[in-house]
């Protein structure tokens, strides 16, 4: 038995990489074979639009069948005593009765549940890593209210020990955002929760970037002495930034069309905002109050961009019909509220009311501990809705942490539900995932089992934790929680 379970060591990886002719280790970091653009068809109008491409490479996977489990697919009704087949990194089959390939590893899921891998739309893992401290506090570039030129991925520390703890909670994909100090905080990045030496080795291939924007109290507080110091100052700041970005986009579009004279001077901030205007980057907007969400929708219409998701949104229930009308998702908590003035009107039925209105409700975390318990937060939102007469089923609530969140990241065709052809991001739970007594037992990413609660050798530890000696319990090596 290994003293240090599932050690992901940079030194070991570097040495392994020097052995010519050898295949990468099953636990080696993502290689450099997959380079995938994060921008869409309009990206050609931005020079070098993808300078930091994903180098993620799936880990070796074995054909696996989980039998006799209750399956919440996030695409239909609960399947009782069903089976899921994982093959070649994809969901090969799911249903009440499926054939098991002869070479498959068969897992008995009697009394257990299977769900898609969880998706967290709002994380700061890696940019505010553990242990907390100023030396590792890299989530807010609070030097100007508009910082569209910064990219969260350039602050992500892949050795953050919170990553493996999120995997142990069933999270397989997350969006890391800049903080909310600024009106425009910079680009977000979508990561797979996998061991890697670099952030590029974690980047979800082909995932679009996001733009973090923030309303309300946080920018006011941070910039009170420099401005903006009021909500009307905030709005003026957004609009000024978009005016400049639109002018920048037109200059580049004209040059790309005519190729006359010298190319316009590049500006990293306007480059990001121009990609939003072209539809290549999603807007993720930190916003608590209903009136401010409505104002941000108006600004988006003024400048012709789309808001993909409002984050936190404790008053989303007040404008749920507007969210549904404009196809804007709400990435929200189950029961956080009242902790500052703009959160005063938070209610526990927020998720259920957004869901009833036909908008996409999403449970997000904004917290390294909460992201380990996303299904428990979904359970609280489900209970609050049922308590006021809004029927929310397990089949509804699982979507709040899977397919709806995947949609907010533009990845719902690849992840977020258990359907043939989708990525085999799968969680086997010890019981109903909405119970506080349930734990994730096994977690697969692209068909590779990267977490096994019962086997310390299949539990990822970052380099930061090398040298950690598990506690001894009754003379046997302890296991990670």
Regions found by a protein language model. Name each.
Residues 13-14:
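C-terminal motif of bacterial Sec signal peptides marking the signal peptidase cleavage site
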Residues 18-61, 469-479:
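N-terminal pre-domain segments of enzymes
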Residues 55, 60, 130-131, 137-143, ...:
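His/Asp/Glu-enriched, well-ordered alpha-helical/loop segment
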Residues 69, 407, 419-463:
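C-terminal cap of metal-dependent C-N hydrolases
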Residues 69, 84, 89, 111, ...:
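Divalent metal-coordination and catalytic microenvironments
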Residues 48-49, 53-62, 71, 75-115, ...:
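Histidine-rich, glycine-flanked metal-binding segment
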Residues 112-189:
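Metal-associated gating/positioning segment near the N- to mid-region
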Residues 162, 167-311, 439, 445, ...:
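Polyanionic/metal-chelating signatures
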């Amino acid at each position: 038995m290994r003293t240090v379970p599932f050690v992901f060591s940079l030194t070991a990886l570097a040495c392994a990489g020097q052995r010519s002719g050898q295949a990468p280790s099953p636990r080696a970091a993502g290689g450099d074979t997959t380079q995938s653009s994060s921008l869409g068809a309009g990206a050609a109008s931005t020079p070098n639009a993808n300078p930091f491409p994903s180098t993620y490479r799936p880990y070796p996977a074995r054909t696996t069948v989980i039998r006799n489990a209750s399956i919440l697919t996030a695409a239909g009704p609960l399947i009782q005593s069903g089976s899921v087949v994982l093959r070649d990194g994809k969901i090969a089959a799911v249903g009440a009765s499926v054939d098991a390939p002869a070479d498959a590893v068969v897992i008995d899921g009697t009394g257990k549940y299977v769900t898609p891998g969880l998706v967290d739309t709002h994380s700061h893992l890696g940019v505010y890593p553990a242990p907390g401290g100023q030396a590792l506090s890299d989530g807010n570039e609070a030097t100007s209210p508009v910082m569209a030129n910064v990219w969260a991925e350039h602050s992500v520390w892949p050795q953050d020990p919170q990553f493996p703890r999120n995997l142990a909670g069933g999270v397989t994909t997350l969006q890391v955002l800049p903080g909310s100090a600024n009106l425009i905080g910079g680009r977000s990045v979508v990561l797979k929760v996998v061991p890697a030496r670099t952030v590029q080795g974690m980047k979800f291939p082909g995932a679009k970037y996001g733009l973090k924007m923030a309303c309300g109290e946080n920018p006011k507080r941070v910039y009170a002495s420099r401005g903006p110091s009021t909500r009307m100052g905030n709005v003026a700041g957004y609009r000024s930034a978009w005016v400049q970005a639109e002018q920048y986009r037109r200059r580049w579009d004209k040059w790309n069309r005519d190729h006359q004279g010298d190319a316009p001077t590049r500006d990293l901030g306007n480059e990001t905002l121009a990609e939003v205007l072209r539809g290549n980057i999603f807007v993720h907007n930190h916003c608590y109050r209903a009136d401010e969400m409505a104002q941000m929708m108006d600004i988006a219409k003024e400048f012709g961009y789309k808001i993909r998701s409002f984050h936190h949104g404790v008053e989303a229930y007040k404008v749920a019909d507007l969210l549904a009308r404009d196809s804007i998702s709400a990435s929200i908590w189950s029961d956080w509220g009242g902790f500052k003035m703009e959160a005063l009107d938070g209610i526990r039925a927020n998720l259920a009311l957004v869901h009833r209105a036909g908008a996409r409700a999403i449970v997000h975390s904004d917290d390294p501990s909460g992201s380990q318990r996303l299904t428990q937060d979904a359970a609280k939102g489900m209970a609050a809705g049922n308590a006021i007469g809004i029927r929310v089923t397990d089949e509804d609530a699982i979507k709040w942490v899977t397919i709806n969140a995947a949609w907010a990241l533009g990845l719902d065709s690849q992840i977020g539900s258990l359907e043939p052809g989708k990525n085999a991001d799968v969680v086997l739970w010890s019981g109903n995932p909405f119970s506080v007594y349930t734990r994730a037992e096994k977690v697969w990413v692209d068909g590779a089992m990267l977490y096994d609660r019962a086997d310390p050798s299949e539990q990822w530890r970052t380099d930061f934790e090398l040298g950690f000696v598990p506690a001894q319990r009754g003379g046997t090596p302890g296991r990670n929680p």
